[in-house]
Amino acid sequence: MSGLCFNPFRLRWSLRSKLPLEPSLPNLPCNPSSSKTNRYAEAETMEKKRFDSMESWSMILESENVETWEASKGEREEWTADLSQLFIGNKFASGAHSRIYRGIYKQRAVAVKMVRIPTHKEETRAKLEQQFKSEVALLSRLFHPNIVQFIAACKKPPVYCIITEYMSQGNLRMYLNKKEPYSLSIETVLRLALDISRGMEYLHSQGVIHRDLKSNNLLLNDEMRVKVADFGTSCLETQCREAKGNMGTYRWMAPEMIKEKPYTRKVDVYSFGIVLWELTTALLPFQGMTPVQAAFAVAEKNERPPLPASCQPALAHLIKRCWSENPSKRPDFSNIVAVLEKYDECVKEGLPLTSHASLTKTKKAILDHLKGCVTSISSPFSSSSVPVNA
């Protein structure tokens, strides 16, 4: 904790005089000749300036009409986030409508994701609100070592926030960007891949499809363990099994999603195949292409990132299975975990990854041969064949 540097302010709960629930925008000049679009653009600019001010963020969260939630493992899940215990620190990531800050909540290092809900764009507002509700609803019921832990949430339009555990080493994409191409050891590749696949195996066991699995949404902690994060576009499989539309990111998106066809949990397996390729190369998938060009290459030409010659054949085979064009040919994460665990055992025993597969095939071939020999031999005392299991 001592190493964290925080801004000298704290969100206090009702310690000041009552603040306005939502600071009003300055009056815009009335110009009969200006179009409605221009007026909305000016209003949006004013709102953005207000939102960009850290002071206004704290004012909104300090207001009395704040809906709060806090995760609990009891029979009844209650969310009672105590904002007097929340300290906001420095921003370390941002997006089009969100910012992520370091913070402390109840003496624990946390990440505070703040989402700005625009008031002048109805479609965007509805989409962001739904993503926020979905992420809170899903995260609050997920408990696994390889899933980022939800701690609390608060909602005060136009600012919504989600508080999760702080992952000090950033995301997997940042980690790979610092590495030389093809430089990760097979031990590291398998360790990271196992973390991801175990988290995804659990997620699918809970009936959840992530829909945006990528290196940017995989976070690393102090021990360099990976946790799956960012559930804004996730959904329960019963609610999105036959859903259409592309909710993920093109470079990692399965072809059926790009084509807006019905899809299943196997879209996550495809994305994992791309991530596994990233681990073996440390490169950005479809580097040199724009996201749209990458989507076209996958959907129309069935292209995939090139597998390097240095990639272990067994690992290359798994990657190809994961990103198969036919979803039914992609393995489940339970199978992926089992395969990676066997590969990990081979590496620890100093054996090549192909050894396990080769030994399995050899053993099966020997058993089949013996079975054929035994069943073809007739007993001298009986015309019946010798039982296989005799």
Swiss-Prot record:
Keywords: ATP-binding, Cell membrane, Kinase, Membrane, Nucleotide-binding, Phosphoprotein, Serine/threonine-protein kinase, Transferase, Tyrosine-protein kinase. The active site is at D212. The keyword Nucleotide-binding applies. CDD domains: STKc_MAP3K-like. Disruption phenotype: Suppressed low CO(2)-induced stomatal opening and impaired CO(2)-triggered stomatal closure. Inhibited by MPK4 and MPK12. One of its GO terms (cellular component) is plasma membrane. The keyword Nucleus does not apply. GO terms for biological process: cellular response to carbon dioxide; protein autophosphorylation; regulation of response to red or far red light; regulation of stomatal closure; regulation of stomatal movement. GO terms for molecular function: ATP binding; protein kinase activity; protein serine kinase activity; protein serine/threonine kinase activity; transmembrane receptor protein tyrosine kinase activity. It is found in: Cell membrane. It is an enzyme of class 2 (transferase). It catalyses: L-seryl-[protein] + ATP = O-phospho-L-seryl-[protein] + ADP + H(+); L-threonyl-[protein] + ATP = O-phospho-L-threonyl-[protein] + ADP + H(+); L-tyrosyl-[protein] + ATP = O-phospho-L-tyrosyl-[protein] + ADP + H(+). ATP binds at F92, A93, S94, G95, A96, H97, S98, R99, I100, K113. Mainly localizes in guard cells. Expressed at low level in leaves, stems, roots and flowers. Autophosphorylated. Belongs to the protein kinase superfamily. Ser/Thr protein kinase family. Serine/threonine/tyrosine kinase involved in the control of stomatal movement in response to CO(2). Functions as a major negative regulator of CO(2)-induced stomatal closing. Does not seem to be involved in stomatal closure in response to abscisic acid (ABA) or light. Involved in the control of red light-induced stomatal opening. Is epistatic to SRK2E/OST1 function during stomatal responses to red light and altered CO(2). Phosphorylates SRK2E/OST1 and GHR1 to prevents SRK2E/OST1- and GHR1-induced activation of SLAC1, thus preventing stomatal closure. 'Suu' means 'mouth' in both Estonian and Finnish. This is Serine/threonine/tyrosine-protein kinase HT1.
